[in-house]
């Protein structure tokens, strides 16, 4: 009877763990969408005074924010053009503006705690970010090269027709048999010079 109770206890514990009743960070949403961008939130304990928060995409460090207690909670960030951020009491939010499908990847946060001691470093929750492009964008990517190629073909065909018609028009006016003017035969100057040399 005892093994049965142990199995039930382990089963209930696993269910509570998977549903997030035991781990408080399981209900935390890491990604949220607003203003055409993605907000990636990384939570940390409220008691932390000095920290370094890094946002990773796979193994690449995208953003690194350092909060120090020195002169009025100074914040420094590496790569400020890419890393727009918002710092609150218990979270750092990084913003990805105008994401496209190439930025879909696994993102996670790494937290280094300096104060209160002891120094700790841990990886926080992560998640896979799927970014779907709209159907209109995909259709434009397909039809834009096709449309450009069709335009070039029509343009070339038009130029060839214009050249052909202009040559035909010019050629018909010169070789018109019903013209009142007759064509003159080309004069060969070599014959004259021979005759001039023979007579003298």
Swiss-Prot record:
Keywords, in A-Z order: Cell membrane, Disulfide bond, Glycoprotein, Immunoglobulin domain, Membrane, Signal, Transmembrane, Transmembrane helix
Glycan attachment points: 23, 89, 123
Signal peptide limits: 1-20
Disulfide bonds: 42-109, 63-83
Modification comment: N-glycosylated.
Regions that span the bilayer: 145-165
Record topological domains on the Cytoplasmic side: 166-200
Residues exposed to the Extracellular side: 21-144
Coiled-coil parts of chain: none
Known function: Stimulatory receptor expressed in activated or antigen-experienced T-cells that plays an important role in the immune response. Upon binding to its ligand ICOSL expressed on antigen presenting cells (APCs), delivers costimulatory signals that enhances all basic T-cell responses to a foreign antigen, namely proliferation, secretion of lymphokines including IL10, up-regulation of molecules that mediate cell-cell interaction, and effective help for antibody secretion by B-cells.
Subcellular location: Cell membrane
Subunit structure: Homodimer; disulfide-linked. Interacts with ICOSLG. Interacts with PIK3R1. Interacts with TBK1; this interaction is critical for the maturation of T follicular regulatory cells.
Source organism, top-level taxon: Eukaryota
Name of the protein: Inducible T-cell costimulator
Keyword Transmembrane: yes
